[in-house]
Amino acid sequence: MGAFPPPIDPSYIPSVSLTRLPATAPTADIIATLERDGALILVDLVSPQDVAAINAEIEPYIQKARAESHEAYDLIPKQTIMVPGVVGKSPTMARMAELDVIDTLRTRVLQRKCTATWEDRTEDFSIDPLLNSSLTYHISYGGPRQRLHRDDMIHGIYHRGGEYRLSDETMLGFMIAGSKTTRENGATMAIPGSHKWDHARVPRVDEVCFAEMEPGSALVFLGTVYHGAGHNSVPDQVRKIYGLFFIPGTLRPEENQFLAIPRSKVLGMSDKMLSLLGYKKPGTWLGIVNNGDPAENLAEVLGMANS
């Protein structure tokens, strides 16, 4: 993809900002903001104790990781450490993926409710969301900013413009701050309202604002929103972000969850997490093994797969 773009001029003053809502805000208010802006900041989503636990649980993997060890992501600079499969490495992060507010929002945005028509009847069913990826974005000093992009490009989504419908969205992300994030140390850039743009509309850096957050708050955004990690210009500071991204259960996850999460860990996970990882059959026949739901006897199914 070539060299990374230059930093945004420090004199630039955003003309827009991200709405901030408490994590305890009514779901209707959060959804209304997502529909309007495509992104917002949920304040105090994760407690200080849980942030500290996540940082401690992930630190050994950060120490082992090579900053440039993300060959599949050419839009990520080498100064960013990406630890993949975080829900399999941090029990606290796995628990965060099941927080009520996260569960409610991903269900509201990404659950697919469908009707099948048979020759003699109709049948309603639902397909629950899947975990698309869980990873770190730890940007060290000197890390350049990313190009502005949309995350839903991984599924080849084409944006036709016209009337906007939240039900058409194919990704919902939660970027949880593990440290104080500022414009200067690489806070994520985002363009509110860009989720409604058509495919031909090109983003400009004079349209961005910055997701500055205290530890435990989270940037929540749709896959249609233009965004990108910022430039870290602060010596001796690391911008720590933990990402949880979800997609409809009808799409293929970016991260291969069947291989990314150790099977020994999978067997101890909750039913909700098994569903998010794709081990549990939804309302249709997706994901069946031996003509049945693998989650009903997962140890036996995994044993068979390992034989």
Swiss-Prot record:
Q: Which residues bind Fe cation?
A: 149, 151, 227
Q: What family is this? A: Belongs to the PhyH family.
For this entry, the protein name equals: Dioxygenase swnH1
EC code(s) of this entry: 1.14.11.-
Keyword Magnesium set for record:
no
Task: Indicate the quaternary assembly.
Answer: Homodimer.
Q: What class of enzyme is it?
A: oxidoreductase
Q: List keywords of the entry alphabetically.
A: Dioxygenase, Iron, Metal-binding, Oxidoreductase
According to its UniProt entry, what is the function of this protein?
Answer: Dioxygenase; part of the gene cluster that mediates the biosynthesis of swainsonine (SW), a cytotoxic fungal alkaloid and a potential cancer therapy drug. Swainsonine production occurs via a multibranched pathway and is dispensable for fungal colonization of plants and infection of insect hosts. The first step of swainsonine biosynthesis is the production of the precursor pipecolic acid (PA) via conversion of L-lysine (Lys) to 1-piperideine-6-carboxylate (P6C) by the aminotransferase swnA, the latter being further reduced to PA by the reductase swnR.
Pathway(s) per entry: Mycotoxin biosynthesis
Organism equals Metarhizium robertsii (strain ARSEF 23 / ATCC MYA-3075)
GO MF terms held by the record: dioxygenase activity; metal ion binding
Its domain of life? Eukaryota
